[in-house]
Amino acid sequence: MDLLPSRYKIHKTKLRWILTMMTMMMMMVMRRGESMRLDMESGNTKCISDDIKTNYMTVGTYSIVNPNEGHHLPPSHKLFVTVSSPKGKSHHHAENVESGKFVFTAEETGDYMTCFVAPGYRPTAKFAVDFEWKSGVEAKDWTTIAKRGQITMLEVEVRKLLDVTETIHEEMFQLIEREREMQELNRSTNSRMAALSLLSFVVTMSVAGLQLRHLKSFLERKKLL
């Protein structure tokens, strides 16, 4: 009679262990979202950059911290927000807002810039902004995916691990490509340095030859040779 409960406990323990191990693996290899609080002042600008890979999804949310909960924010607590790509393409633009969200897929690899501008106000106002920026696997809404697909949390964790594995695979190829580019750059640099060294040697020997010729002519005129 006790076999079934015992097996159930063993299965439940194994399941917890598997979930724990999966969670630890994801914490080690998955790109974490950046959550921060920015201190703003009227007339000031603060920018944050994030290195995002091509085809990575990125999600950002921001909101001004209300110093008096239950009351409206004062008129001085407003933001101008812009998000731009490494080449300057705008992915988000908002004016005179208290909160907002941006979602896009990176079209190129590089540093994406998010800038917060607090408009000028008199008297000067100070306030805080909560900002969370997620990219890659971390940016996906796994709770919504689980609800839509009607799948278990174990299946969600497995899908996360698959996405993490694919991400690592892509980054490995990118690292290999960068290494190849660096090797080509090194070869090109070495070739140029060799050519420059040869040119310097030729110029030096030519100048030395001219000096010897001039010295010989001078000594002959003085009848020292």
Curated annotation (Swiss-Prot):
UniProt motif (COPI vesicle coat-binding) ranges: 218-225
Record Pfam families: EMP24_GP25L (PF01105)
GO biological process, one term: vesicle-mediated transport
Principal cellular location given in the protein's record: endoplasmic reticulum
Location of Omega-N-methylated arginine modifications: 178
Sugar attachment sites: 186
Subcellular location: Endoplasmic reticulum membrane; Golgi apparatus, cis-Golgi network membrane; Golgi apparatus, Golgi stack membrane
Range of residues in the leader sequence: 1-35
Endoplasmic reticulum keyword on record: yes
Topology in the lipid bilayer: Single-pass type I membrane protein
GO terms under cellular component: endoplasmic reticulum membrane; Golgi cisterna membrane
Regions of this protein lying in the Cytoplasmic compartment: 211-225
PROSITE patterns, per the entry: GOLD (PS50866)
UniProt short sequence motif COPII vesicle coat-binding, positions renumbered to this chain: 218-219
Coiled-coil positions: 175-188
Domain GOLD: 45-160
Transmembrane feature ranges: 194-210
Comment block on domains: The cytoplasmic C-terminal domain contains a functional dilysine-retrieval motif, which is involved in the retrograde Golgi-to-ER transport of the protein.
Known role: Involved in vesicular protein trafficking. Mainly functions in the early secretory pathway. Thought to act as cargo receptor at the lumenal side for incorporation of secretory cargo molecules into transport vesicles and to be involved in vesicle coat formation at the cytoplasmic side.
Subunit comment: Probably oligomerizes with other members of the EMP24/GP25L family. Associates with the COPI vesicle coat (coatomer). Associates with the COPII vesicle coat (coatomer).
Protein name as catalogued: Transmembrane emp24 domain-containing protein p24delta11
